From Swiss-Prot:
Protein source organism: Streptococcus gordonii (strain Challis / ATCC 35105 / BCRC 15272 / CH1 / DL1 / V288)
Enzyme class: hydrolase
Gene: tuf
All copies of domain tr-type G, residue ranges: 10-207
Record's subunit section: Monomer.
NCBIfam families cross-referenced by the UniProt entry: EF-Tu, PRK00049.1, PRK12735.1, PRK12736.1, small_GTP
Region (G5): 177-179
Record-stated family: Belongs to the TRAFAC class translation factor GTPase superfamily. Classic translation factor GTPase family. EF-Tu/EF-1A subfamily.
Protein name, entry field: Elongation factor Tu
Keywords carried by this UniProt record: Cytoplasm, Elongation factor, GTP-binding, Hydrolase, Magnesium, Metal-binding, Nucleotide-binding, Protein biosynthesis
EC number(s) from the headed UniProt entry: 3.6.5.3
Length: 398
């Protein structure tokens, strides 16, 4: 049989499994791929067993080693990319670095245990890094005889979610057994199909990158005699068109306005550049020395320059090439945003004396000059050009 063409007509959604160690995240991932392959066979829906998912390859993302398994599958309505990380540290790194941007996640909780410390931590991380939609899968229900006990566990999970500002009373909770489904028990297979229908319905279709407001981090600037100033870089999101009014944001206190008079890619003139394109944009009314690497070109009003923010950060271990020693309050490294380094100072949370390599922590940062940042912007922490940490902006303060 000929391979089916990749069907782009289906909306694409990124999800993942989160939850405490040994609660069944990887078994559930295997069960989803296997049950979909049995019930909705297609070239995309191929069963993956536990061992192949668990043996996730090491990836390096911004200098950090992360083990992550990527699987894909489809329902009748959607195409999914699903991430599953074997170790707790891999989840923390994945979420904080933005390596795995999830539109929603399935929180797996073993009914035999109820919520555990990493359940709480993954919920908090989801809240911090902007994973807005969680669905709960209460796993291993076949091992619990007592209906009341299941109700108590469900209440406990809902309360915990509400504590972190998720709609704990309303979000879907599905009770099943990933292992039984994997083994082919049709009752539990049906529950996996219910779970996927719920994911289809409950996790909204993500906004496409091209529908978001323009953001183009400036990498290089040059002037063309008689035509003006060109800024080049890779469009992070949105679309840039000839005659667009744009703003140049960051480094300087004030925002500058300009008009795009040309867009080119590979030396060819274009009408527009899209998210993901490497383009040069010709700007009217901007001198060569008025724009620099580290600034961004953005849709007017969509992003502002800031110097103070809260962030969730992961500090690399010595083995990852990070620091060998802890750091303390008022530590002053460089913060690398998109294309440039800016010095800033770190304030640790009350009661935290120091941060050890391998820790993740919420910090307050004050930069020496403003950068275009917003909730969800990722950054690296660097010392003398080497990466010692990775983080994400969770709250703007000034």
């Amino acid at each position: 049989m000929a391979k089916e063409k990749y069907d782009r007509s289906k909306p694409h959604v990124n999800i993942g499994t989160i939850g405490h160690v040994d609660h069944g995240k990887t078994t559930l991932t295997a069960a989803i791929t296997t049950v979909l392959a049995r019930r909705l066979p297609s070239s995309v829906n191929q069963p993956k067993d536990y061992a192949s998912i668990d043996a996730a390859p090491e990836e390096r993302e911004r200098g950090i080693t992360i083990n992550t398994a990527h699987v894909e599958y489809e329902t009748e309505k959607r195409h999914y990319a699903h991430i599953d990380a074997p170790g707790h540290a891999d989840y923390v790194k994945n979420m904080i670095t933005g390596a795995a941007q999830m539109d929603g996640a399935i929180l797996v909780v073993a009914s035999t245990d109820g919520p555990m410390p990493q359940t709480r931590e993954h919920i908090l991380l989801s809240r911090q890094v902007g994973v807005k939609h969680l669905i709960v899968f209460m796993n291993k229900v076949d091992l619990v005889d007592d209906e009341e006990l299941l109700e108590l566990v469900e209440m406990e999970i809902r309360d915990l979610l509400s504590e972190y500002d998720f709609p704990g009373d309303d979000l879907p909770v599905i009770q099943g057994s990933a292992l039984k489904a994997l083994e082919g028990d049709s009752k539990y297979e049906d529950i996996i199909m219910d779970l996927m229908n719920t994911v289809d319905e409950y996790i909204p279709e993500p906004e496409r990158d091209t529908d978001k407001p323009l953001l183009l981090p400036v990498e290089d600037v040059f002037s063309i005699t008689g035509r003006g100033t060109v800024a080049s870089g890779r469009i992070d999101r949105g679309i840039v068109k000839v005659n667009d009014e744009i703003e140049i944001v960051g480094i300087k206190e004030e925002i500058q306005k300009a008009v795009v008079t040309g867009v080119e890619m590979f030396r060819k003139q274009l009408d527009e550049g899209l998210a993901g394109d490497n383009v040069g944009v010709l700007l009217r009314g901007i001198q060569r020395d008025e724009i620099e690497r580290g600034q961004v070109i953005a849709k007017p009003g969509s992003i502002n320059p800031h110097t103070k923010f809260k962030g969730e950060v992961y500090i690399l271990t010595k083995e990852e090439g990070g620091r060998h020693t802890p750091f303390f309050n008022n530590y002053r490294p460089q913060f690398y945003f998109r294309t440039t380094d800016v010095t800033g100072s770190i304030e640790l949370p009350a009661g935290t004396e120091m941060v050890m390599p391998g820790d993740n922590v919420t910090i307050e940062v004050e930069l020496i000059h403003p950068i275009a940042v917003e909730q969800g912007t990722t950054f690296s922490i660097r010392e003398g050009g080497r990466t010692v940490g990775s983080g994400m902006v969770t709250e703007i303060e000034a």
